[in-house]
Amino acid sequence: MTALLVIIYLSFAGLGLPNSVLGSIWPQMQLDLGAKVSLVGYLSMTVTAGTVVSSVLADRIVRRFGVAKVTVVSALMTGCALLGFALSPGVPGLFLCALPMGLAAGVTDVALNNFVALHYEAKHMSWLHCFWGIGASVGPVIVAASLRAGGSWRMGCGLISAVEGALCVLLVCTISLWNRASGSAGSLQGSAPAARAASIFRRKGAMPLLCGFALYNAMEATAGLWGATFVHDSFGISTSDAALTSTLYFGALTVGRIAAGFAASRRSDRQLIRTGMAVSALGMLLTWLAGSAWLAMGGIFLIGLGFAPMYPAMLHATPSYFGAELSQQVMGVEMAFAYVGSTCFPPLFGALAAPLGTSIYPGFLLACLLLAAAAIELADRLFSAREFCGKGEKQII
């Protein structure tokens, strides 16, 4: 299944490719379309709304059509949405394209994560999310290159749309690999959902685990969005120097996930999560107590490094908590909670920072980490305490 694994990695890079494009093109897009600066927030919320809806419905969709077809159609939808952005004459067209972009992202995210969790070792889950980070990093580079070449944001969107189109063609040409893998490992395609989505919430340990997903993604998004502002406001360095904070943070996430992939063969999911919590807590304390901008940036680097193994390990543990039959459905709900956390908490921090100042940044993150640790540990104890319903599966977290 090595060839298929490469396709999955490329698909996840394609999933990350448009993720940071909106922020990259918005300064020029806003001027060209005469839109309000704040409109980008509503566009982002539209994408997120589509992602949450399709995450919850992903189990039914994938069971009906299979992972391969879902991934192909999602790549096609993403490419068409980006092309729509490039050709849009005004703001209404942007909103029409934002929704299908979100719908495509959510179902693909669930389908690929569940496929890897069921069929591959834990290290591949970490590397999968590393490729998402690579895709998210390449998107703005493509936009910047098109702008430097004298093009516009429309050209940047068109180029990324072409990349998604090429990925779609590649997926169509390799669809037989997916069919063979699903057949050999046992496919859920064509089967009915194992349980109603609402029943997941009644399972012992489910709610603490879902809260852990929301809180983790709240931390990751808040740390990335507000880190540079915190360093700039606290130490008075230039905006160009402060911008390095974001590079260090996201670089740490990417490098950390590569390293976590190698560590996953020797460490359980539980150990990876706890190690990540400890390293990120150390980074938060260093950021809080730092006497210089560079120490604070080093602390934020450690925060990203600590976060790196946590989310992939939490997702990889889902089949061992709920069983292969339920894992895809549960993963959809987990990701819906994750998206809600990453959408709501950065604005919440902004609302608190307005009267209190961005100096609350490390304390805010540490409070979220303590709550996330409590929720995840409680879930682990509750799942470990009851007899597991899966057959032939051992607990790996």
Enumerate the predicted regions with their spans.
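Helix-to-loop junctions at the C-terminal end of transmembrane segments
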Residues: 54-67, 256-269, 353-354
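Cytoplasmic helix-loop-helix junction between adjacent transmembrane helices
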Residues: 97-131
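Helix-loop-helix hairpin linking two adjacent transmembrane segments in secondary transporters
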Residues: 128-179
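A late C-terminal transmembrane helix in Major Facilitator Superfamily
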Residues: 321-358
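Extracytoplasmic gate region of multi-pass secondary transporters
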Residues: 22-23, 204-247, 251-254
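Helix-breaking motifs and short loop linkers at transmembrane-helix boundaries and internal kinks
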Residues: 34, 66, 87-92, 236, ...
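Interfacial helix-cap and linker-helix signal at transmembrane-aqueous boundaries
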Residues: 29-30, 61-62, 142-151, 231-232, ...
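Conserved MFS/SLC helix-loop-helix module at the cytosolic interface between two early adjacent transmembrane helices
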Residues: 53-92
